[in-house]
Design a protein with these regions (language model features):
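FAD-binding core/adjacent interface of flavoenzyme oxidoreductases
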Residues: 1-4, 59-151, 166, 172
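Beta1-alpha1 glycine-rich phosphate/pyrophosphate-binding loop at the start
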Residues: 1-72, 163-176
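N-terminal Rossmann-fold NAD(P) dinucleotide-binding loop
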Residues: 12, 157-158
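Conserved acidic functional residues
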Residues: 84, 159, 175
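Short, glycine-/small-residue-rich phosphate/pyrophosphate-handling segment
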Residues: 153-155
Length: 176
């Protein structure tokens, strides 16, 4: 029995671990489109400000650990580009096909980009992945940024603002 889990965030990683506890023999494959699995998203603001200065501390796990501890095959940079439900196959990166007995979609969330003029400006960032946080850090350092505006007053938005202030940036929050 082969189960394919599409998405390697917290939900996909937890699903893989739970499935392994329920069945020690089945084949479990996690397909993650990015180059990271199961990151500590709540730590991203603190990574941006270097309160957490070790990038590896944001990574909750890695493919090798999943294989060693759980016998779960994690494949990074493996974007599912189509699903053939009738024949029970997924296409990966428009190249490889994998068959499955069970399919779990654990696609997670994506940041909301409000419909406002200029939202696609290269100086505007979303923060959802470790790669996003890397880009924010790099931009702030490279451009000697002094001011920041955070759109969104949820947990991550407030923590981003807190950490921008920690970095010495004049920071405002806009809640839509």
């Amino acid at each position: 029995m082969r189960t394919i889990i599409v998405g390697g965030g917290a939900g996909g990683a937890s699903c893989g671990a739970r499935l392994r506890r329920l069945d020690e023999k089945s084949e479990i494959i996690i397909l993650e489109a990015t180059d990271e699995i199961s990151i500590a998203n709540c730590g991203l603001p603190y990574y941006c400000s270097d309160v957490i200065n070790d990038r590896e501390k944001i990574l909750v796990s890695n493919p090798q650990t999943f294989k060693q501890l759980l016998n779960v095959d994690v494949r990074l940079n493996s974007k599912v580009t189509s699903i053939d439900r009738k024949n029970k196959k997924v296409a990966i990166n428009n190249q490889t096909e994998l068959s499955y007995d069970n399919l779990v979609l654990a696609l997670g969330a994506s940041p909301l980009k409000p419909s406002i003029n200029g939202i696609d400006n290269p100086k505007i960032f979303t923060v959802r992945t470790l790669s996003d946080a890397d880009k924010i850090k790099e931009f702030i350092i490279k451009n000697n940024v002094k001011n920041a505006v955070v759109i969104g007053g949820g947990f991550i938005g407030v923590e981003m603002a807190e950490n921008f202030i920690e970095m010495g940036l004049n920071t405002s929050i806009i809640e839509l």
